[in-house]
A protein has these predicted regions:
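Glycine-biased, small-residue-rich flexible motifs in mid-sequence functional cores and linkers
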Residues: 1-277
């Protein structure tokens, strides 16, 4: 159930402070019968998964998890593509004790756009999202944006004002309805399992949406168009069948997407081959 699923996300370049806070929040959530969801990446993700796996179940909750796993990792590629490679052992441990999840077919490579898709899945699976460390522009903020759109609660851990690793956290607290989280109890309370917290924006309930990142030329693409665009090489043009395999889409769909991308200046045809525009 979503009310027992807490997503914990943040920077790949986590500080010792960020890893410590993450471990405390993740372990407490699992001890109270919740599941910790993250993306399997380095930094905050890895710290969240490890703490969830190592957390001893509280005696009164050990027999009452109702099949809720301690942790779930959402992958950007296929389930047979352990990424990052340095986390293969960790991801196998997550698979043994919890779940690995992906909406990509086996063999699909993790690409930039698929990481953004993964963030959407993390937000959708969770009842609430906790952002521990995030830079000014980060995937964690992207996950928070999806969570706001889905009506999920978002909590943010503040950091030193001098730390670039917390700049995105402070931005969320200033510009969005995110809630300030300073203890593991407040993190769990995002799921409705504890006392109410003060809102962001100085403790007031904010009506502002999550901060928007600067627009990219690809921001308006459909999912299929984005997959085709990701499959296009930057320099060496490739035949359509290669693009079809990389994108994991049917040939007619790829051809239609290539035509639209070409009109938008995002794809270039070189004889019977294609590359990015």
């Amino acid at each position: 159930p979503a009310d027992r699923m807490l997503a914990v996300v943040g920077s790949r370049e986590a500080t010792a402070y960020g890893r410590t806070v993450t471990a405390r929040c993740a372990a407490h959530a699992v001890q109270q019968g919740a599941c910790v969801i993250s993306g399997g990446a380095y930094g905050i993700d890895g710290a969240a998964h490890r703490a969830a796996l190592q957390a001893p179940a509280a005696p009164e909750d050990a027999a009452d998890r109702d099949g809720v796993p301690p942790t779930v990792a959402v992958l950007a590629g296929g389930l047979d593509r352990f990424y990052p490679a340095g986390h293969e052992d960790l991801l196998r441990a997550v698979m043994a004790a919890g779940l690995l999840v992906s909406e990509m077919p086996p063999g699909a490579s993790p690409t930039r756009y698929r990481f953004l898709q993964r963030n959407r899945v993390i937000a959708a699976l969770a009842g609430a999202v906790l952002v521990v460390e995030a830079r000014w522009r980060s995937g964690a903020q992207n996950t928070a944006g999806h969570a706001f759109g889905l009506g999920r609660e978002v909590g943010v851990v503040p950091g030193p004002v001098t730390s670039p690793s917390s700049a995105g956290c402070h931005r969320l607290l200033q510009e969005s309805p995110a809630r300030l989280v300073t203890t593991e109890q407040e993190a769990l309370a995002l799921l409705g399992q504890g006392p109410a917290r003060s809102g962001g924006a100085g403790g007031r309930t904010s009506t502002r949406a999550a901060p928007e990142s600067a627009a990219r030329p690809t921001d308006g693409l459909t999912m299929e168009e984005a997959l085709v665009h990701e499959a296009l090489p930057l320099r060496q043009a490739v035949p359509v069948d290669r693009i079809t395999v990389s994108a994991g889409l049917a040939l007619p769909t790829v051809l239609a997407c290539l035509s639209r991308l070409q009109r938008a200046g995002l794809a270039e045809r070189v004889e019977d081959r294609w590359r990015r525009g």
